[in-house]
Amino acid sequence: MKVIKRNGKAEEYNCKKIKKAINFACDGLSVNPLKLEAKFDESLFDGVTTKAIQDNLILHAKNLSTPTDDEWLLVSGRLATMDGWGIVGCYDKPFINYFEEQRNNGEWSHKNFDIYTKEEVEIIGTFIVKERDLQHTIASVETAESKYLAKNECIQMLFIGNAMLYASVEKTPQSRLLRVKEFYEELSNLEWSLASPQLMNLRKGLNNASCFILAPYDDLNSIYDAFKDAAQISKNGGGLGWYLGFIRAKGSSLMGTDGGSGGVLPQVKVLNDTLVYINQAGKRKGAGTVALPIWHNDIMDFFDIQTEVGDPRSKSFDIQPQVCFMDLFMQKLEDNPQQEWITVCPHEVKEKLGIVLPNMYNEDFVEAYSEIEKAVEDGVLKVFTKYKVIDLWRKYLQVFFEKGRPYAGFMCKVNRDNPNKHDGFIYCLNLCVESFSNTKPDVYHHTCSLASLVVGRIAVNELSNKASSLTRLLNNGMMITKAPVVESENHLRDYRTIGVGIQGLADILAREWKSYEDLDFITEVCERIQYGCVRESIQMAKEYSPYPKFKGSRWDVGDIFDEYHKNSVCPDLDWLEQKQLCKQYGIYNSQLTSPAPNTSTSLFMMASAGFMPHYAEYFYEDNKDGKTPVSSMYGKDNPIFYANSVGYFKQHELTKAVGAGQKFVDTGISAEYVLDRNIHEVTAKDVSMLVKEAWKNGTKAVYYLRTIKVGEQLVKTDELCSSCSG
């Protein structure tokens, strides 16, 4: 029987080659190679290509996998990896040769590669452990090939290339090489998970920031400058947040004409279509969220931007809405939902009362709202609507239940905890609701780079050290990349916001035989990570300088350290010592931690996604090649934990876990919730309780809601979160 090789030549079929490949892929695993041989023999025929042989081996190994025999996913991944090795040939030559080829062909075009001498590159080549490619399952390999690997790359080359760039800013050749090895070891051992923009863009010298928030003024130039910036950000792979709270309401005066304003919905439509047109570097859909505060007079129309109600021309189906809730509204809802709530136009309130309502939170908002109530009663304000609190709440719940959105942001809590409230305001949440900081129209666009600790592979007592190193990596990355627009450059310069996250909280809970009810343990995980980040950021301030807006911040005043000391569950961590060091040296970053959903990168890292419970012990991921099985990190060791997947939880109870972690997260936590009608009866009361309990339990946001109908299954998708954090 003849087989056709990749070069088109025919040769006799050699079964020994196939058996050798199968045995290599099965080596050290608890699988029987004969099972794969038997399956494979059924697909042989005269004239079969070697590519078809390899594809069939990969497919059959994948299909042999079951929840109790999931090591076949590793066999399939190894076979796919070996196939990639043969095609790319990156390990068949000295690393210095490979490095020069990637530089010459433009795949590794970042200018900081030039910092390394030939001798240093040769030393770096000795760090590479080719065999670590073989620890990736088929879902991991497919994710890498479809999203992250550049031309002629294998996984270890991706890791070493990024490690070289992150280390390139170190001050001496010796320290550079030490950092390259350190960063490479963490990445290749799958203890760190970089965000998608860093995996895709860094080696080419493109943007590697994940999250952006824009807040245009109610001014034509400001709005259209922001549209242009949004296009640039999307082009460069960023996920977008857009605050609408400055924009005058529908029916407000415009250029002296009463009732001339069209309100916020036309602006949302333009942004929606901009993000559809300008996708993310051609690899992913453009993605963004638009935010409107609950006090804005367009709020009822905003609720319907993705429903079937109203004018089709006002709809925006490709963007994610969010509502910014104030504590006063939530408290009225709690105390007496029949109370009145007045929505107004921010432009009119500013013109007639001198109140910039988007800048009002907590007690300031309560005072401003009292003035607004009086102005309405006195007939000063013309553009307003009176609602019962319960009517607005019911409308929100109806849309949230049907569509899973709008997101909910609890903006008084967000601004109360803001480390930089001395210098501005946080207006809304980012696309995945975990990263936000001060934004100033036409001056600052919130900009943040993210990466996560794969906590299921890290010992609890090592979390702080790993977080310190990852903080260094993200800060080094900030130094070597150019943000896509000037306002982002301004933000990076003055605030230096990064977001160290948590990938696979479920996995560390499973490994340690804990549960989502073990709130102190969840707090401990977050505290140890925050401590490591803060410690390294203070050290970097000592080496370089504090972030420019440090003076007057909560870090400078020290109350944030007092709060950490008060909430601490780790006796071995000395927050008061860090407070003294910060007083002496300052801190390099304004904000440090942001647990993101990281669904896409979790496939690459073979970990549960983000902070919330896993989807299932064993599930199927949809991709261009069909459905690929995905198993759990500790499914064999602790199957009972993974059997209790996200749908089994009372979702309002999960908000306690998020609140427990939030005590030691200085921005937000991306938390999506699932109501599974196959497991629990679901009522409007359940949805209401979920959002209210999230507010009461000290969380800052509710990401989206998934409602699973009877007879349906939870389908895993990464469309939203892979748009920024990955």
PLM regions with names:
Residues 10, 49, 154, 179, ...:
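Secondary-structure capping and boundary motifs in well-ordered enzyme cores
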Residues 469-489, 513-598, 669-670:
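Internal maturation/activation junctions in enzymes
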Residues 120-140, 144, 433-440, 474, ...:
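Catalytic alpha/beta core of large soluble enzyme barrels
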Residues 72-106, 325, 414-441, 498, ...:
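Terminal amphipathic helices with adjacent charged low-complexity linkers/tails
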Residues 14-31, 161-167, 609-614:
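Short, surface-exposed, low-complexity cationic segments
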Residues 150, 158, 162-176, 180-256, ...:
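Function-dense linear segments that define catalytic or interfacial modules
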Residues 9, 31-170, 178-184:
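Core nucleic-acid recognition elements
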Residues 261-269, 276-284, 289-390, 406, ...:
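Conserved catalytic alpha/beta cores of large enzymes that bind or transform nucleotide phosphates
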